[in-house]
Curated annotation (Swiss-Prot):
Family membership: Belongs to the ACC deaminase/D-cysteine desulfhydrase family.
Any one Gene Ontology BP term: 1-aminocyclopropane-1-carboxylate metabolic process
Taxonomy of the source species: Bacteria, Pseudomonadati, Pseudomonadota, Betaproteobacteria, Burkholderiales
EC code: 3.5.99.7
Protein name (Swiss-Prot/TrEMBL): 1-aminocyclopropane-1-carboxylate deaminase
Amino acid sequence: MNLQKFPRYPLTFGPTPIQPLKRLSAHLGGKVELYAKRDDCNSGLAFGGNKTRKLEYLIPDALAQGCDTLVSIGGIQSNQTRQVAAVAAHLGMKCVLVQENWVNYHDAVYDRVGNIQMSRMMGADVRLVPDGFDIGFRKSWEDALADVRARGGKPYAIPAGCSDHPLGGLGFVGFAEEVRAQEAELGFKFDYVVVCSVTGSTQAGMVVGFAADGRADRVIGIDASAKPAQTREQILRIARNTADRVELGRDIASGDVVLDERFGGPEYGLPNEGTLEAIRLCAKLEGVLTDPVYEGKSMHGMIEKVRLGEFPAGSKVLYAHLGGVPALNAYSFLFRDG
């Protein structure tokens, strides 16, 4: 496998820490050891997160092409668009963000706080569009790219989640290589890695990275899209493309993509009672915050899998914390009593 042939623009602090979740593990019976890899703490650029790790591989391509404007898309409380805005500000580039109405949630300040507030503060051209949720390419995004060109700019297209991009899976191949180095220091290997999946390139990159030592199917995706068939197809497609690019040396089979569909409801961006319980439990036991859209759902999935005995006793499970906490302010009514 050859990730090193791809240029990488450093936007993160370096390897993200692995933190034992001792109190949560004990609360769930102590038979499974839970850890978190804190990609939510990976950068000084507007709170960072998993997209910042991905952007390290997209930015060299943007600069090599002489682009002057980063153009991306997400929901109103998109972590992706906030991280793209931060990177654009850091590099002195322009930024156009298409923010669609992906979440059926209504709050008086939903479009004025959290991620979208930060994007505006960092100088991004934020464009609100009423279209609903979908992980595919969007006409509103293509229109924004055309608008930048019409105005004489040179846009760089960054799809939702950095995912359906030729280089979108590379960052989390690097995540797997980083984990292997940390495992050597810790003196043990993780039996499972739990990760939230929506647009797919985070899990896809992990699948490829961990396939290098036979652990592709130990990456347990927790669907948060509530459209798992579409998400699964995109994970597999991105993983296969990424495997070819990094010269993995083996095919990615459909069985290498494990996606648990039980925790994504009721729909994208809306938590269920299990999501909210998991958010509160992790906060109170560990002081670790998760959000209602992504990490709360993957935390719920991990907790339930422990409770149901789906991880064998003695397993060491690594939870990939991808970020998302800036969106909590937009859901303040849900947590008005804690």
